[in-house]
């Protein structure tokens, strides 16, 4: 076996290793994607919106009690899966699973650019693949996985100095969820200060994303049946009125929810979000539990909290560009939520900055490997840590994919009462 492996070139061994990881990522995201076979959590809103897009090109104002409070892009993405695979649980979630898998490839490419190391690139991609929150969001037809992907893609494009493309992608992020505006503002301000292009930068990261955002509303403009479309004879005035209503909804959302979680406890996994829970009778026990729990892999997230503090320290004392960019995207995706402690928020919103938490961990590993005398031992220690994270991921895996457990096994995974 060793002679067979030694006969394969280093490049081909690397391709096999990464291909295997990508295959693992795809399998964990696509196998049994139709489970649960019903709409879970906010899928009820977004799948319904996707159906409207396919039927009418716009989310319809049909007198229903619901109010549409997010832009169209993410729901168009969900609609693509339904168009390809039918109005079925697999179809609802296909696009999320595809984007989630591509995100792992993207993190690999980003780490390759930042750290110029195959080992560190594989570490970054592996940690993404082994995160429970990313897996759950990749298997659920919500908007946040698309938001996370667009922000991550913009980061990659900035690393490539492709600023126009990054601006367009940030427009797509904004057209998915408004929370992208914090990242857009932070990125634009950073580039304005760095490059001092006081005319071009505002056009790139002000006008361009706005035009992309407005373009995402094309179906609304072309229809007479969209929400608030007929508020005024002037379509733009109607859109502005509608956006005021949306803004009022977001700023006044304080309704209690059993799984709400303030932003301050996201990093410590204080209150994960249960998307689905049932008590089936097919686990060979008197009492069974089936759950889809949006919970980051605990060992990974707690390591991420420590790594974040270390990365901030490195940036403060060394002003390293890579640390600064990681922190720019991470903190602009996270810190604004701390300003709204009364608003109803959920832990799974953290998926927007989760990739940058992973990159923060890899950044700290990269710093640890700079000492050549200790590199071998520290690399082995990093591999042990990844193995422990993998075991932790495997332990919680049934909760991520809606697997059926007997009640005692399910309860054993509730490490804190706040997870129930």
What kind of region is each of these model predictions?
Residues 22-25, 124-129, 170, 174, ...:
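Short helix- or helix-capping micro-motifs
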Residues 90, 94-115, 153, 310:
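Transmembrane-helix motifs of polytopic, lipid-linked glycan transferases
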Residues 20-21, 107-130, 163-165, 324:
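Transmembrane-helix signature of polytopic, membrane-embedded enzymes
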Residues 106-109, 127, 146-170, 357-360:
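Specific aromatic-rich, kink-prone transmembrane helix
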């Amino acid at each position: 076996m060793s002679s067979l492996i030694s006969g394969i070139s280093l490049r081909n061994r690397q391709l096999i290793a990464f291909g295997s990881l990508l295959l693992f990522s795809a399998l964990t995201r696509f196998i049994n994607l139709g489970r649960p076979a019903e709409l879970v959590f906010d899928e009820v809103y977004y799948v319904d919106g996707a159906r409207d897009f396919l039927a009418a090109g716009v989310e319809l104002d049909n007198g229903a009690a619901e109010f549409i409070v997010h832009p169209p892009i993410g729901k168009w993405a969900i609609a693509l899966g339904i168009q390809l695979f039918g109005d079925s649980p697999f179809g609802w979630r296909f696009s999320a699973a595809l984007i989630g898998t591509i995100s792992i490839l993207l993190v690999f490419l980003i780490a390759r650019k930042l750290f110029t190391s195959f080992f560190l690139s594989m570490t970054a991609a592996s940690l993404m693949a082994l995160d429970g929150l990313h897996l759950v969001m990749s298997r659920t037809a919500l908007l946040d996985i698309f938001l996370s992907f667009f922000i991550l893609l913009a980061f990659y494009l900035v690393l490539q100095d492709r600023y126009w493309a990054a601006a367009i992608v940030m427009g797509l992020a904004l057209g998915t969820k408004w929370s992208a505006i914090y990242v857009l503002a932070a990125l634009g301000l950073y580039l304005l200060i760095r490059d001092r292009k006081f005319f071009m930068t505002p056009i790139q990261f002000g006008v361009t994303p706005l035009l992309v955002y407005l373009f995402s509303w094309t179906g609304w403009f072309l229809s007479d049946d969209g929400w608030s479309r007929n508020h005024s004879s002037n379509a733009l005035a109607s859109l502005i009125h509608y956006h005021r209503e949306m803004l009022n909804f977001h700023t006044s959302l304080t309704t209690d929810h059993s799984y709400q979680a303030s932003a301050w406890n996201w990093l410590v996994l204080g209150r994960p979000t249960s998307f689905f829970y049932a008590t089936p009778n097919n686990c060979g026990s008197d009492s069974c539990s089936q759950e889809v729990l949006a919970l980051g892999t605990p060992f990974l997230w707690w390591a991420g909290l420590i790594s974040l503090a270390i990365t901030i320290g490195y940036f403060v004392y060394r002003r390293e560009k890579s640390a600064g960019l990681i922190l720019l995207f991470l903190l602009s995706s996270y810190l604004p939520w701390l300003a709204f402690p009364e608003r109803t928020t959920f832990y799974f919103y953290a998926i927007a900055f989760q990739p940058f938490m992973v990159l923060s961990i890899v950044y700290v590993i990269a710093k640890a490997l700079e000492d050549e005398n200790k590199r071998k031992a520290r690399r082995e220690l990093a591999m042990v840590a990844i193995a422990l994270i993998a075991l932790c991921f495997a332990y919680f895996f049934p909760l991520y994919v809606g697997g059926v457990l007997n009640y005692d096994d399910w309860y054993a995974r509730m490490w804190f009462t706040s997870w129930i």
